[in-house]
Amino acid sequence: MFYMTGQEYDVVVVGSGAAGMVAALTAAHQGLSTVVVEKAPHYGGSTARSGGGVWIPNNEILKRDGVKDTPDEARKYLHAIIGDVVPAEKIDTYLDRGPEMLSFVLKHSPLKLCWVPGYSDYYPETPGGKPTGRSVEPKPFDANKLGPDLKGLEPPYGKVPMNMVVMQQDYVRLNQLKRHPRGVLRSLKVGIRATWGKVSGKNLVGMGRALIAPLRIGLREAGVPVLLNTALTDLYVEDGRVLGIYVRDTTAGDDAEPRLIRARHGVILGSGGFEHNEQMRVKYQRAPITTEWTVGAVANTGDGIVAAEKLGAALELMEDAWWGPTVPLVGAPWFALSERNSPGSIIVNMSGKRFMNESMPYVEACHHMYGGQYGQGPGPGENIPAWLIFDQQYRDRYIFAGLQPGQRIPSKWLESGVIVKADTLVELAEKTGLPADQFTSTIERFNGFARSGVDEDFHRGESAYDRYYGDPTNKPNPNLGEIKHGPFYAAKMVPGDLGTKGGIRTDVRGRALRDDDSVIEGLYAAGNVSSPVMGHTYPGPGGTIGPAMTFGYLAALDIAATAAASRKG
């Protein structure tokens, strides 16, 4: 930790993910002295571990890349899927100010973005939804440009062999490697990119790390220090106003004395959710729940939420998360995307029955795993654990949990019981504890749907979102395939997440609010430490990062405006 006693800045930002970095970048360019403190030994948080997508309708990148959209369409879409869970003014503020924020970031950092063609909004058939997608993602970035700051960049989620850099738009094509010429061509493109990076001496990073690295350079050029291994312990208040934070050097042990960093004009919390806080998860979220199923950053233990609550901050949507059906593999959970959409697979509960469209958006899928409205109800979740069922043909054709098509399933996965293999469906039922008669009946009925191309029970394959990760060569439905080629497999599925959703209630300026909607002066929040503008839903790829960046930006602008007004006064 690069900490000196008696530090004072205009603005103190807690957390170095997208929310914190954009907030700090904005404050610095408003002429405010700014510091970022980060609890972890690396910067980037959950953003660096993510796909790096940014969902902001009508931004300059989408316009440049020829995406046809209007503010009215985007407004109609978001209001339809969010409903009245979130104030309309907050939704509209996000849509109105998000494009402005992104243009600012592109101007003041080396970040380069591009549209993700065809990566559909998650509810494209809803009025205003876009089957062609509204998501942008970072282009591969040479992390060597970070210089000495490279060692502090958050490691990637999953292994990246031989400097291979995969973008979101690559992943869907790579899943078609054995099925479509586009898969072969994309594989060649990714290989050429890796080779070019190696021979040219570049250290290419992709996805979330390609978003964070340019932001870090932007902060460096703006003169903003990032203090690693610096954990928030409490907020400092004078005369009812937040004017600083207490921090602890995490390398000095739990008994290290807290130190004060003063903030003349405000503190912005961008410290992430509480996905790695077992106590908070058990308190707020429905069973079964654990910190072992999340892929969020390990440092996210709700510190900002706890500190703000002490000052009377209202908390909202604490029961929810950015869920996704997850395979709890040995060592690290696997957040399943294409695995649920590829034909030749279904998900069943412990009764051997299907209970949802397996290909639906991942937050909603976990709501169905728990059961009830938005996953809420009495007692433990109704469909947990569930099992993803597939056959050898599926395994030979598609990527599964990072394994290439046809690649042998590691013995440790089988030995752990997370993946079960059997020669027959009846044997698979016995090994997984499923009722064989009901299970085989479910498979038989589903196979009929696969032959006809119509899922009469859950309409899988009817949405453009379903089809995005489907197999275009599989007829008559890209998401439905018979399960009949042994051996057969079952992969345990649990409600994992990218991070928790609930947090501090904020207004359109990012200010922290109490239960009566009064403002906690000097305190702001953005990202997963705050209650989401998206409510219980998820509009499209990048629907977490887009709001995090936007409300971090707006918080910094509000502090700058308040500071300017106080100087005039």
UniProtKB/Swiss-Prot annotation:
Gene3D superfamilies the UniProt entry points to: FAD/NAD(P)-binding domain (3.50.50.60)
Alphabetical keyword list: FAD, Flavoprotein, Lipid degradation, Lipid metabolism, Oxidoreductase, Steroid metabolism
EC number, UniProt record: 1.3.99.4
Gene Ontology BP annotations: lipid catabolic process; steroid biosynthetic process
Cofactor: FAD
Catalysed reactions, semicolon-separated: a 3-oxosteroid + A = a 3-oxo-Delta(1)-steroid + AH2; a 3-oxo-Delta(4)-steroid + A = a 3-oxo-Delta(1,4)-steroid + AH2
Domain of life: Bacteria
Similarity comment text for this entry: Belongs to the FAD-dependent oxidoreductase 2 family. 3-oxosteroid dehydrogenase subfamily.
Free-text function comment from the UniProt entry: Is also involved in the formation of 1,4-androstadiene-3,17-dione (ADD) from 4-androstene-3,17-dione (AD) to.
Protein name as annotated: 3-oxosteroid 1-dehydrogenase
Organism: Mycolicibacterium smegmatis (strain ATCC 700084 / mc(2)155)
